[in-house]
Amino acid sequence: MNQSYFNLLGNITWLWMNSSLHKEWSCELLARNVIPAIENEQYMLLIDNGIPIAYCSWADLNLETEVKYIKDINSLTPEEWQSGDRRWIIDWVAPFGHSQLLYKKMCQKYPDMIVRSIRFYPKQKELGKIAYFKGGKLDKKTAKKRFDTYQEELATALKNEFNFIKK
């Protein structure tokens, strides 16, 4: 680890401290969510005039790890961050209103990707939904088809995981 690693970790931590959602989270959770992203270079940090303004990280999961993640968003091990090709946003931190800029930059960097995230409702942090985002060059029809395929595979895996019985 070098000085730039610690500067990066400090910038991301500062954004977490300024996020109404993240500032309540533990240092252990920060380490679990941020260090693998840095080590695998699976993050984007936006800086304006030397000040960090937005950050996101992602993991590329296989279906099995995806099922595990859906059941417990804090379950990822460092090795699982690069276990497959099913991209999930792990963190999205834009406490100063730069979420659209971060989204635009991600769409430019990954123009052909489908990316999913678990979004939480501010007043009901235990309640979330799966959202998906498409890269800038992916048309809506193709993106929807790909997303529907991912969702069908995930639903089947979850059904098998929980041994649901069809009535």
Swiss-Prot record:
<keyword id="KW-0204">Cytolysis</keyword>
<feature type="active site">
    <location>
        <position position="22"/>
    </location>
</feature>
<dbReference type="GO" id="GO:0031640">
    <property type="term" value="P:killing of cells of another organism"/>
</dbReference>
<dbReference type="GO" id="GO:0016746">
    <property type="term" value="F:acyltransferase activity"/>
</dbReference>
<keyword id="KW-0354">Hemolysis</keyword>
<dbReference type="Pfam" id="PF02794">
    <property type="entry name" value="HlyC"/>
</dbReference>
<keyword id="KW-0808">Transferase</keyword>
<comment type="similarity">
    <text>Belongs to the RTX toxin acyltransferase family.</text>
</comment>
<feature type="active site">
    <location>
        <position position="91"/>
    </location>
</feature>
<dbReference type="GO" id="GO:0009404">
    <property type="term" value="P:toxin metabolic process"/>
</dbReference>
<keyword id="KW-0963">Cytoplasm</keyword>
<protein>
    <recommendedName>
        <fullName>Leukotoxin-activating lysine-acyltransferase LktC serotype A1</fullName>
        <ecNumber>2.3.1.-</ecNumber>
    </recommendedName>
</protein>
<dbReference type="GO" id="GO:0005737">
    <property type="term" value="C:cytoplasm"/>
</dbReference>
<keyword id="KW-0012">Acyltransferase</keyword>
<dbReference type="InterPro" id="IPR003996">
    <property type="entry name" value="RTX_toxin-activating_protC_bac"/>
</dbReference>
<comment type="function">
    <text>Involved in fatty acylation of the protoxin (LktA) at two internal lysine residues, thereby converting it to the active toxin.</text>
</comment>
